[in-house]
Curated annotation (Swiss-Prot):
This is Ribulose bisphosphate carboxylase large chain. It comes from Idesia polycarpa (Iigiri tree). NCBIfam families: PRK04208.1. One of its GO terms (molecular function) is magnesium ion binding. It is found in: Plastid, Chloroplast. It holds the Pfam family RuBisCO_large_N. GO terms for cellular component: chloroplast. The modification N6-carboxylysine is found at residue 191. The record marks 324 as: Transition state stabilizer. The disulfide bond which can form in the large chain dimeric partners within the hexadecamer appears to be associated with oxidative stress and protein turnover. Binds 1 Mg(2+) ion per subunit. Heterohexadecamer of 8 large chains and 8 small chains; disulfide-linked. The disulfide link is formed within the large subunit homodimers. It catalyses: 2 (2R)-3-phosphoglycerate + 2 H(+) = D-ribulose 1,5-bisphosphate + CO2 + H2O; D-ribulose 1,5-bisphosphate + O2 = 2-phosphoglycolate + (2R)-3-phosphoglycerate + 2 H(+). Its EC number is 4.1.1.39.
Amino acid sequence: VGFKAGVKDYKLTYYTPDYETKDTDILAAFRVTPQPGVPPEEAGAAVAAESSTGTWTTVWTDGLTSLDRYKGRCYDIEPVAGEENQYIAYVAYPLDLFEEGSVTNMFTSIVGNVFGFKALRALRLEDLRIPPAYSKTFQGPPHGIQVERDKLNKYGRPLLGCTIKPKLGLSAKNYGRAVYECLRGGLDFTKDDENVNSQPFMRWRDRFLFCAEALYKAQAETGEIKGHYLNATAGTCEEMIKRAVFARELGVPIVMHDYLTGGFTANTSLAHYCRDNGLLLHIHRAMHAVIDRQKNHGIHFRVLAKALRMSGGDHIHSGTVVGKLEGERDITLGFVDLLRDDFIEKDRSRGIYFTQDWVSLPGVLPVASGGIHVWHMPALTEIFGDDSVLQFGGGTLGHPWGNAPGAVANRVALEACVQARNEGRDLAREGNEIIREASKWSPELAAACEVWKEIKFEFQAMDTL
């Protein structure tokens, strides 16, 4: 058969509704908005083609390989209820299209080119099914939830954190002082802000030294293990690893990375270093909203969360459901489960398009932070459960009496909520009452309750199904 040149419809090759998906396929659910006049099958097939083996015309070299073995296939298309001209296109990719252990390569293939495609008005990657055959090629989180609890000797409750503010402008010594006050008051962790790297007003090495001093002082006073997320994010991978090495030499328990701005390659390198050297790794998701906020275009955060679990991190920010930053309850809980659990059933009501089996990849602790304070504690304890980190930045440092009393207020509120829950009380219904009772015994908590009694951040949720 001679080579037949020319342009042919994608759907002739890449739309295969009778395809049976394999256990080793990577499956993707795309929300496709075709341009007017483009049939959904053609749009779905175009996505499958452009994100796998296809190009815009048939090429002579197609004859030198087996397209059937390597092509992505659009195997199902369904209209999105309540939206006109939006479809969910399901695409199956053969495992051999991807380099083992590389989130970078996976994303370059699946979302690399296709989002600029002219036949589509908009495109969003809603979910990915990562087969065990692929996830087993990743180290995953450096330590995971259980090992972290064992290292810190903290069980049966969420962990408490605080981002040091003002995020930019403090000198290293004053920064360390703020860290010490928070940890002394009863927090488990304090945190570098995501944009604190190594700036003229505070170089990274000075900050690391003063924070380590604060850590050890607070540890000696409280008898509890303390941590400060030292942000190792830097302009080059080598510099990032250098900072992580220095943190390890100081003997601190945890470092931090901005995984989207730093990039998956850097993040995976750091995760490997952290496992090899006994450091926990806290992950911040700066830049995520650029990618995930639009309903019809981009990548949903649940995909970025799955990618992080593969690349590696022990904590990741995941919205609060109640604070100042976005997060719809069911959907947020959907990807919180994807981060923590071994096996997650498909559940479209929570935005989970595929059953995901992580086999034994360690879990990641979700971090709730952003505009939360003591009155939110019952809701947060109920929504996130024990395996989470609750971070109060302004909710600690904004306390009228200072950082340490702010930390005391949060710790008392948390312990009261955990105790009430363990006694079988309903946090959703009696939450305010529980906090009020506890504040009778803690003047610090009473003062915090007074300051924030009226604060609410209420807007319509953007992320609905």
